[in-house]
Amino acid sequence: MTGFDPKVFVQSLTGAPGVYRMLSAVGEVLYVGKARNLRKRVGSYFARGAHSGKTHAMLQRVAGIEVTVTHTENEALLLEDNLVKSLKPRYNILLRDDKSY
């Protein structure tokens, strides 16, 4: 995964709901998130502004992003939950404890 340009990538995204996976240079899934609007949510990571230390550290390692478009927000929520539980991404601390929604 070389030459990842987040601005170009964000422009190519849809405004539909879905799930995104942030990947390292070796393909490790760093973070899984859901969005009502993929373009706005993923774009928010790369907009100017203050990020928490955890988010800043993660963004330094992002070399690519994969997305799955869903039909509904509920479908995105379920998919995100399943992916976090199965992939156990390093930066998904909040969803790791198997809490039910």
Where are these regions (language model features)?
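Acidic, glycine-enriched active-site microenvironments
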Residues: 1-101
